[in-house]
């Protein structure tokens, strides 16, 4: 099976003792796209202005101002320009270890399952969704605390992130696990394409790398557009 490490982002976000950071970004001014990848940290994309395309797992969305996209550890995701459009957004990235340690009930019940892909969160939070105002208020507060950096701001940010996750867990229902056989196959196929883009690549090669039959690979779900009603 191909090595999937090149799809994995390993950049350190924030200080080692406080792994949290916010990055303002604009597509296409800063870069035309963010290639398909995953990481061990939590990543939020908070769309501030304009529109763009966001892929989360096997689903693609038309992102609009106000949307929040939630990428748990291990979830494949990508961003790109919607033709003729500009999208301004904030990347909010943090390690789950920041929020709880060993022996902590919240870590055992929520954070560790989220880290390992056994607990899924909604990948998109839109303005009309239940809990949106609560969740977005937490992000606004975390942004402000991070900007001011007064004494104790780390405690405030940590608290707001926990409240944000609580808002998502409260509306998640019976979501499937974040990492499924389909997404694992997608990671393998994308890695294979990255490694062999200059040569011929056949469905049989991809199926062999995934450990499944060509028919199963061909009929697996493909990324699909989800339009806002």
Question: Which residue ranges define each predicted feature?
Answer:
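Short acidic-glycine-tyrosine-enriched beta hairpin
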Residues: 58-70
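Tight coil/turn sites that cap or link beta-strands
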Residues: 30-31, 66, 74
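Short, Lys/Arg-enriched, Trp-marked, Pro/Gly-tolerant hinge/linker segments that flank
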Residues: 121-132, 146-210, 224
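Short hydrophobic/aromatic patch on the recognition helix
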Residues: 66, 216-218
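Short, conserved beta-strand element in jelly-roll/cupin
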Residues: 37-53
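Conserved small/polar residues in nucleotide/adenosyl-binding loops
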Residues: 218-225
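Conserved short histidine dyad/triad with adjacent acidic residue
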Residues: 22-38
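A hydrophobic/aromatic-rich effector-binding and dimerization subdomain
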Residues: 2-25, 76, 80-144
């Amino acid at each position: 099976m191909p090595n999937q490490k090149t799809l994995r982002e390993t950049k350190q976000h924030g200080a080692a003792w406080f792994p949290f950071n916010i990055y303002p970004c604009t597509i296409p001014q800063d870069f035309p796209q963010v290639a398909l990848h995953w990481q061990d940290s939590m990543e939020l994309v908070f769309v501030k202005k304009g529109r763009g395309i966001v892929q989360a797992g096997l689903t693609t969305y038309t992102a609009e101002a106000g949307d929040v996209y939630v990428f748990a550890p291990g979830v494949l995701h990508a961003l790109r320009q919607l033709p003729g459009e500009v999208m301004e957004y904030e990347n909010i990235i943090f390690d789950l270890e920041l929020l709880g340690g060993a022996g902590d009930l919240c870590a055992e019940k929520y954070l560790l399952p989220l880290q390992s892909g056994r607990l899924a969160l909604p990948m998109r939070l839109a303005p009309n969704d239940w809990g949106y105002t609560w969740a977005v208020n937490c992000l606004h507060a975390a942004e402000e605390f991070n900007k001011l950096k007064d004494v104790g701001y780390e405690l405030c940010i940590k608290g707001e992130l926990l409240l944000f996750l609580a808002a998502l867990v409260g509306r998640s229902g019976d979501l499937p696990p974040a990492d499924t056989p389909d997404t694992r196959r997608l990671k393998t196929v994308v890695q294979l394409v990255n490694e062999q883009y200059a040569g011929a690549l056949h469905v049989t090669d991809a199926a062999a790398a995934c450990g499944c039959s060509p028919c199963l690979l061909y009929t697996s779900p493909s990324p699909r557009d989800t339009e806002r009603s």
